[in-house]
Amino acid sequence: LTPAAALKVSTLNFLHRVRPTHFLKKVLMTNRNPEALQAFAGKVSNSVTGGLNCALTMIGDQLGLYRSLAEKGPMQSGGLAEATHLSERWVREWLYQQACIGQIEYDETADSFFLSEEGKAVLAQEDHPAYMGGMIQSVVAMFDTVEHLPECFRSGLGQSFDDKGEGCACGIERMSRKFQTDYLVPALLPRLDGITERLTAGASVADVGCGGATSTIAMAKAFPASKFIGYDISLHALERARANIAAAGVSNIKLHNPTVDPLPEDSSIDFITTFDVVHDSTHPRQLIDAIKNSLKRDGSWLCADVKGLPTFAENRRDNPMATLAYSFSVLVCMSAGLSTP
């Protein structure tokens, strides 16, 4: 059998083993609405498939499989394994899964695999606005923490960002990197009255919840006369920030952990930024008050945060991102916000 034929046969055999026709018919017949039961079971099955695919997509991202396909074009499993210095058998099975789910294209005649232009953008080109490797990485990093969620539900206390591990911090940093490096300084800051002029002249800036400091670095490079302080309570994020700052070669950034070195209360800061921070805060009112007290009377606060609709009913009906947003909330955002009493 060719690999393509073997894939079809093995898939059919697997489906026959796990879902025998006579058994499925019997189950459906016991339900008053077998079509609805089958549709609902299919919906849940798709969710299971999506969860498994997240893990395998992260593998493709971390091992450079997508990048190699994007750069070298159509390849058979042996060629991709050789290009990435990986085991052919493992690469072959991964390619079969990726082709079945539709993330990688398959040419039966040539028995080769390749990425569409859309696939390259979403899976291989980290500088593309549609790239999703960071999101996938952060989602997979949450898997290890799921076993702790039952206790969160019982106690009401959530998990901090550091409880999610370094992978979550890295994934979130990668998710926001494109905006912070390519959009923040050239496109967003000029829309704020007087900000670029003030930063050019030299200002005191606090990037609160700086994460890996990609936004801090972008501003520090563009405005060398200004002094920047990145604040974050995540030790994983601060470690990444130190490494990123060193790699960028900027000298006008300092890093503080606000649990040790909080924002100043002397109204000495010209400009404060928060990017997707307030909704994750354990005490948002205290954070807002601290920001207010640290700003000069003519200072400015750039607050970018999650955009939702006023009610759950509206979000469920009209917000296409509602499912993703609520999923992230339970696993990360609300959990972090409830991580301290």
Q: Language-model segments: which ranges?
A:
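A short acidic, Gly/Pro-enriched loop at the edge of an enzyme's catalytic core
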Residues: 261-272
